[in-house]
């Protein structure tokens, strides 16, 4: 959705090179950087054209260089270009929930127009320092492994690492479900430069799990903004900002806590690199744009907690060739407050969510923030699991019987902890048949403490698998004993 104005400022196309369009305007009427330009007319076959571009450079000699948000097929020299006088604007508010948009805020789900009362420009300044909530606050997700070992910061940024088929989508769905039910919040999903099939699959799964309510679209908990792999680099570079603008409205106007998902933050950088090359800028390290730090910073600095509400962002991070020193992931890491690493090894054991308890990290895991008991419990859980990992080679070669009594006890408790880190999800109920569980942080801490203290050494391992709090594990253990 582009701000439309009267045809007061009209230019003409002088050159088209791929997605880059050079436009000449009358003297003294050059549009500003980031203004949206609209090209309407007919191509040589007589078909209607409607292309939106964003001004990126002022070339001098009354010319500007703009990057197109859609295909430039059919554009020719001399076509009329209208300067809208404002940046690209997208619809915001409740009307966006349950709908799919493109970078321009146009609905692409064939469900008709969006009745949004207001629109917002996608280019905005980050909140002022005086408006920020500076006291770190833990964002409770209700997912045991995350809340205990790698807690999220309210208004923070979390990197989500994981290959195909380890449960990223289900984890995202559960977080969307939990923020809606427990925090009264909403979510915005920004699909940046990923496969169209994945976007469609996600939409269908959201409908199946009830995150999007087909019967009453207003009850949906998420808005989706997609700019897929096949789209021009301009669209992929800006779609993250379109999603962020929708999230900002829920935070600033509705005063809600918002979850913003960006999949994938690397594709945002990649699109910026393509645009930079098209604009003729000198590349920097590994061929990335010279403005890499600025581009990432402008997006990330708008994702924060204010005194009114918060945007907590979970960003899938693709690491090219598994090289963490690559400039794209390295620049992203500088902004992250926590990392959630999904492990294929845990997924193959049937431990879901397959969050790696040793590789996942958080800056929030400090006694001064989470409290002494939480910190001590988390570190004890990690050291127990680390010791189990070290002993696995010995167990594989010599067997459990060759271990000392103390090590055998550590292994038994570690296996219970590993099982207890699994949890039934609300959004997976239709597949597993087990009702989902939201576990409060204090229940999570006390549960793991009781395993570490040896209070539950007599319970079978299986009692801890796919349960909510520790009370449920005790009841399941009693039931298993009775059956045996």
UniProtKB/Swiss-Prot annotation:
Keywords for this protein: ATP synthesis, ATP-binding, CF(1), Hydrogen ion transport, Ion transport, Membrane, Nucleotide-binding, Thylakoid, Translocase, Transport
Record's bilayer topology term: Peripheral membrane protein
Enzyme type, top EC level: translocase
Annotated coiled-coil segments of the chain: none
This enzyme's EC code(s): 7.1.2.2
Predominant location: membrane
Positions contributing to ATP binding: 162-169
GO molecular function, one term: ATP binding
Pfam families per record: ATP-synt_ab, ATP-synt_ab_N, ATP-synt_VA_C
Entry's Gene Ontology cellular component terms: plasma membrane-derived thylakoid membrane; proton-transporting ATP synthase complex
Stored PROSITE patterns: ATPASE_ALPHA_BETA
InterPro entries: AAA+_ATPase, ATP-synt_VA_C, ATP_synth_F1_bsu, ATPase_a/bsu_AS, ATPase_alpha/beta_chains, ATPase_F1/V1/A1_a/bsu_N, ATPase_F1/V1/A1_a/bsu_N_sf, ATPase_F1/V1/A1_a/bsu_nucl-bd
Reaction(s) catalysed (UniProt annotation): ATP + H2O + 4 H(+)(in) = ADP + phosphate + 5 H(+)(out)
Compartments where found: Cellular thylakoid membrane
Protein's UniProt keywords contain Cell inner membrane: no
Similarity comment: Belongs to the ATPase alpha/beta chains family.
UniProt-listed NCBIfam families: atpD
HAMAP family named among the record's database cross-references: ATP_synth_beta_bact (MF_01347)
Quaternary data: F-type ATPases have 2 components, CF(1) - the catalytic core - and CF(0) - the membrane proton channel. CF(1) has five subunits: alpha(3), beta(3), gamma(1), delta(1), epsilon(1). CF(0) has four main subunits: a(1), b(1), b'(1) and c(9-12).
Function: Produces ATP from ADP in the presence of a proton gradient across the membrane. The catalytic sites are hosted primarily by the beta subunits.
Entry protein name: ATP synthase subunit beta
Species this chain originates from: Synechococcus elongatus (strain ATCC 33912 / PCC 7942 / FACHB-805)
